[in-house]
Design a protein with these regions (language model features):
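Membrane-interface "cap" regions at the ends of multi-pass membrane proteins
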Residues: 1-28, 57-62, 66-79, 84-86, ...
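Membrane-embedded translocation segments of transport machinery
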Residues: 2-4, 171-326
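Helix-loop-helix connectors at the membrane interface of multi-pass transporters/channels
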Residues: 4, 108-133, 246-253, 257, ...
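Transmembrane helix-boundary motif of multi-pass solute transporters/channels
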Residues: 9-49, 204, 258-260, 265
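Transmembrane helix-loop boundary segments of multi-pass membrane transporters
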Residues: 29-47, 160-166, 291-295, 313-321, ...
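Inter-helical loop and helix-membrane interface segments of multi-pass membrane transporters/permeases
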Residues: 33-37, 73-90, 103-154, 158, ...
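Membrane-water interface regions at transmembrane-helix termini and the short interhelical loops
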Residues: 37, 86-90, 144-168, 244-252, ...
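C-terminal membrane-solvent junction of multi-pass transporters and transport-like membrane proteins
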Residues: 80-83, 87-90, 344-356, 379-437
Length: 455
């Protein structure tokens, strides 16, 4: 095998990891899932999950990736545990699944850049969303988005990905921050802040009964699977992405420090997007929960239609969202591409193109009808993501064990105690929390009948 590429700089890796993490998950999914599933309650569970489960799980993925120096599937084999390859396969499969509809939403974003410039949505933001979010329009833009992703991945790690992500995070923070300030000045926004930021403690409850299987009830049953999986989704966990990215990292770098940076920045961007979108929904009189997948697009389009220089602001905003979406989508495609390139020694550009084509095909139903998109998304949240993260934690916690601590500590000045605590937590509390998430997800999936595809 030829010499593996590595990141040019330490900042390169952090930026790419942040670039992978910050994406439509934060800007599109987070506000709409928050407004659909309980507002501040969702926020509390999400933040707790990001720190309490996401951080340890991210460290687990970093360790697997750096130690093995290989792609997300090959890694398990190289670490001497062939039987655990299924975890990698599940992760890569989950990434494949998610990218198929992620790309459809990326296509919407492309459309909204144009729609802002021409003012096409100014007259009727809601009906505009309805007409461009499904059907032939959406399909064509889904194809264009996927082509862009393929082009960047084909270029290789340093040239393509590293360069594309450097400017993105600062621009996102600046634009979202400015919008948040503007929203704050609007009348009618305040109930939005209450809904988003002040949790009703009575909603944070969950009860369990055993007859004979555990069955849960209470307000949190619905919130947990979505909020915890939202943390996984937005941190790019359970899809082999962080394994793959960490495989390009040197032994002299502190994985611990890097992962904290990623978690904090990522959650901050999500909350910032929430501070823009949720109060806006209230200003516009949209009932929380009824915004759906169009919440971001409709609420912001309505806002841009009212703003002075709205066309320009809108176009710039959606352009930045596009960059965020691209840098995330790149890392999803990179996972599969790197597996095929490592394993079969095939040429990177060709592999990226073929895989991109397959993912495009898988996404066609979602582009055609948003009911399919919702179905793909629900299955990812309630089943695939928690299952896949569970696999990673079981592997690192119970199978790989001690060597993982050594790998974690390499390149950092942390003491053994921190490493041992991490491993112990990953083995116990964190795994239990993921099990609960999975159980609740599957429970609601079957109770609602949401497993049945919308044919
Ligand atoms: N974390 C990305 C987002 O929030 C999505 C993603 C998941 C990207 C997994 C890569 C890998 O949009």
């Amino acid at each position: 095998m030829s010499q593996r590429e590595t990141w040019a700089t330490r900042a390169g890796f952090i930026l790419a990891a942040v670039g992978s993490a910050v994406g439509l998950g934060n800007i599109w999914q987070f506000p709409f899932k928050t407004s659909a599933y309980g507002g501040a309650t969702f926020l509390v569970v999400y933040l707790a999950a990001a720190l309490g489960i996401g951080l340890p799980a991210m460290l687990a993925e970093f360790v697997i990736g750096r130690q093995s120096n290989l792609n997300a599937i090959g890694a398990f084999e190289r670490l001497g545990h062939r039987n655990w390859k299924w975890v990698g396969v599940l992760g890569v499969g989950t990434g494949f699944w998610i990218l198929s509809y992620y790309s459809v939403v990326g296509g919407w974003v492309l459309r909204y850049i144009g729609g802002s410039l021409t003012g096409a949505y100014f007259a009727g933001p809601a009906s505009y969303f309805g007409s461009v979010s499904a059907g032939l329009d959406a399909l064509v833009l889904h194809a264009v988005f996927m082509l862009l992703v393929v082009a960047i991945v084909a270029g290789g790690v340093e040239d393509g990905i590293e360069r594309a992500t450097k400017l993105m995070v600062p621009s996102i923070v600046v634009i979202l921050g400015a919008l948040a300030v503007w929203v704050f000045t609007l009348s009618g926004a305040s109930p939005g802040y209450v809904y988003f930021l002040s949790p009703d403690l009575s909603q944070l409850s969950l009860s369990v009964s055993f007859d004979p299987f555990p069955s849960f009830s209470g307000p949190l049953t619905n919130v947990i699977p979505f909020a915890v999986s939202q943390a996984f989704f937005s941190l790019s966990l359970g899809m082999g992405a962080m394994i793959t990215y960490a495989s390009y990292v040197g032994e002299d770098q502190s994985l611990f420090g890097d992962s904290i940076t990623v978690v904090v920045l990522n959650s901050a961007v999500g909350v910032l997007a929430g501070l823009v979108v949720i109060p806006l929904l209230f200003v516009q009189g949209v009932e929380p929960g009824s915004g759906g997948a169009g919440a971001l697009f409709i609420s912001l389009a309505t806002a841009f239609a009212e703003l002075p220089a709205g066309r320009l602001v809108g176009a710039v905003f959606f352009a930045v969202v596009l960059i965020a979406a691209l840098s995330s989508a790149i890392s999803l495609l990179e996972v599969v591409t790197s597996y095929v390139v490592d394993t079969y020694g095939a040429r990177r550009p060709r592999v990226a193109a073929v895989l991109g084509g397959l993912i495009f095909l898988l996404g066609t139903p979602s582009a055609w009808d948003t009911a399919w998109l919702t179905w793909f998304d629900t299955l990812a949240y309630q089943l695939l993501l928690p299952l896949s993260v569970l696999g990673v934690l079981l592997f690192v916690g119970w199978v790989y064990g001690r060597p993982a601590v050594e790998e974690l500590l390499s390149g950092s000045s942390l003491g053994q105690g921190v490493g041992a605590t991490w491993l112990w937590l990953a083995r116990t509390v964190v795994i239990l929390a993921v099990l609960l998430t999975l159980w609740l997800g599957v429970q609601t999936l079957f109770l609602d009948g949401a497993v049945v595809p919308p044919v």
